[in-house]
């Protein structure tokens, strides 16, 4: 495993292009585009203010930079660096901006969610969509880019509108049986739309493309409900994470629950492999001691080593006592993601923040648990194979695969605190992001990594 040099970064804004050829990063008001293979700077663009959001067009030819405080969006072209577009929403303000799937239209959401403005880069025409709902996930596109679903709120009721992306004509408009709609998401095959309600009302609804209600699912009443939702890439399963610390798996045939995964603090099953991160301070030999002691700032002292150990059951996981009299308590399933082959599901229970649970979806059972020394900040699956990358806000990267686990120290002066990460679409590298910097991590082939994992006490 190799690492690149460290580059400057602002606001964790660093994204690979969809075609995998470029890497865009932001340093305050500057946008830097690099070649992924050489990391040489290809283009350097200067925006009018500090960049708060970036997004590549689907064809990787354009990149959007949003400056919400100024109500501005600037669009840059990689093929024609001298060309650029500026969109000023003026007094209407700006709270969100995204590309349409064709990469030639930009959707801007104005302040207070009064409307969505659709700007065409080709014809310079402008269209308006009224009544967008202010919710966590209110816009979703089908994978083939043909349709857009939009959550709306009008006359104190929730609605969903489905638009044809080629001409922005309204295809379907229907009300949803929700108290306060929180999110919508298309299945990867584009046939079913999942709609879920506020956490105060446990309800998830499944609609067809023509607006027919296919099914409604509710696990319980009178308690905090849904916290997270994820489709499997195969569209066969819908995972619903709840505030009660369980994940419920719905199937695509009957839309009924086929199983539920609990997240207890104690693991007693000897068939479950529990990997515990262990830290060991390096032993300083007599030759390593210096007299007098080194001055502050004279160089970093040897850092502690980290590795995984297989814990013997029963295992008690570290829990966090939630503050229940405040909003958004740290309980329930806050993170969940399917592997690209739909074989595995990774989850995190927010009141057991140091643990990542990996579930075998084929056998509908718990496969492994990874307990870190620090709370898990983020995890993401390799796009090409069942390999999970994890970061905890420290200077280490953690990898899990069915072959086992490994912990890798990120090199560099001082501590490189990995706050987030994103895979390259090839699965051969990933970007590691800290508060003010980023670097690239290059991985060997799966055979080499698998061998390394087994040497570190892996389990198959």
From Swiss-Prot:
It is found in: Cytoplasm; Cytoplasm, Cytoskeleton, Microtubule organizing center, Centrosome; Cytoplasm, Cytoskeleton, Microtubule organizing center, Centrosome, Centriole; Cytoplasm, Cytoskeleton, Microtubule organizing center, Centrosome, Centriolar satellite. InterPro entries: Centrosome-WD_assoc, WD40/YVTN_repeat-like_dom_sf, WD40_rpt. WD repeats lie at residues 46-86, 89-129, 176-210, 221-260, 328-369, 371-410. GO terms for biological process: cell projection organization; mitotic spindle assembly; positive regulation of non-motile cilium assembly. The keyword Repeat applies. Pfam families: WD40. The keyword Cytoplasm applies. It comes from the Eukaryota. The modification Phosphoserine is found at residue 281. Keywords: Cilium biogenesis/degradation, Cytoplasm, Cytoskeleton, Phosphoprotein, Repeat, WD repeat. Ubiquitous. Predominant expression in heart, brain, liver, thymus, prostate, and testis, and barely detectable expression in lung. One of its GO terms (cellular component) is cytoplasm. Its main location: cytoplasm. The SSX2IP:WRAP73 complex is proposed to act as regulator of spindle anchoring at the mitotic centrosome. Required for the centrosomal localization of SSX2IP and normal mitotic bipolar spindle morphology. Required for the targeting of centriole satellite proteins to centrosomes such as of PCM1, SSX2IP, CEP290 and PIBF1/CEP90. Required for ciliogenesis and involved in the removal of the CEP97:CCP110 complex from the mother centriole. Interacts with SSX2IP. This is WD repeat-containing protein WRAP73. It comes from Homo sapiens.
């Amino acid at each position: 495993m190799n690492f690149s040099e460290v580059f400057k970064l602002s606001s964790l804004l660093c994204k690979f292009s969809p075609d995998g050829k470029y890497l865009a990063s932001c340093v305050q008001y500057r946008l830097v585009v690099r070649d992924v293979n050489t990391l040489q700077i290809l283009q350097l663009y200067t925006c009018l203010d500090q960049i708060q959001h970036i997004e590549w067009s689907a064809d990787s030819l354009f990149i959007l930079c949003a400056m919400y405080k100024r109500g501005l969006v600037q669009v840059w072209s990689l093929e024609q660096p001298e060309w650029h577009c500026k969109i000023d929403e003026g007094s209407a303000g700006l709270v969100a901006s995204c590309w349409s799937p064709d990469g030639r239209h930009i959707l801007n959401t104005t302040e207070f969610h009064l409307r969505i403005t659709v700007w065409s880069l080709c014809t310079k025409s402008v269209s308006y969509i009224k009544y967008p709902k202010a919710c966590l996930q209110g816009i979703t596109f089908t994978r083939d880019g043909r349709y857009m679903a939009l959550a709306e709120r009008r006359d104190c009721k929730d609605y969903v509108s489905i638009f044809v992306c080629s001409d922005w004509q309204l295809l379907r408009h229907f009300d949803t049986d929700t108290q306060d709609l929180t999110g919508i998401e298309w299945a990867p095959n584009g046939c079913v739309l999942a709609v879920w309600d506020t956490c105060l009302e446990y309800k998830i609804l499944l609609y067809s493309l023509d607006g027919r209600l296919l099914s409604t699912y509710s696990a319980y009443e009178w308690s905090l409900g849904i916290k997270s939702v994820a489709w499997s890439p195969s569209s066969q399963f819908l995972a619903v994470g709840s505030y009660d610390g369980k994940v419920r798996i719905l199937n695509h045939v009957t839309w009924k629950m086929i199983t539920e995964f609990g997240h207890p603090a104690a693991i007693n099953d000897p068939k479950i492999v529990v990997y515990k991160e262990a830290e060991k301070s390096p032993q300083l030999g007599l030759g390593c001691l210096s007299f007098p002691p080194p001055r502050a700032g004279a160089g970093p002292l040897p850092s502690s080593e980290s590795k995984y150990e297989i814990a013997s059951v029963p295992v008690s996981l570290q829990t966090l006592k939630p503050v229940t009299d405040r909003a958004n308590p740290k309980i329930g399933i806050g993170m969940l993601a399917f592997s690209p082959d739909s074989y595995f599901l990774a989850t995190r229970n927010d009141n057991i923040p140091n643990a990542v649970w990996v579930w075998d979806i084929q056998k509908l059972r718990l496969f492994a648990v990874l307990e870190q020394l620090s709370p898990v900040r983020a995890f993401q699956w390799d796009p090409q194979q069942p390999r999970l990358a994890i970061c905890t806000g420290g200077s280490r990267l953690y990898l899990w695969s069915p072959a086992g686990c490994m912990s890798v120290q990120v090199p560099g002066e001082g501590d490189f605190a990995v706050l987030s990460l994103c895979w390259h679409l090839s699965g051969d590298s990933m970007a590691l992001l800290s508060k003010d910097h980023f670097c690239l991590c290059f991985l060997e082939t799966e055979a080499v990594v698998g061998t390394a994992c087994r040497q570190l006490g892996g389990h198959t």
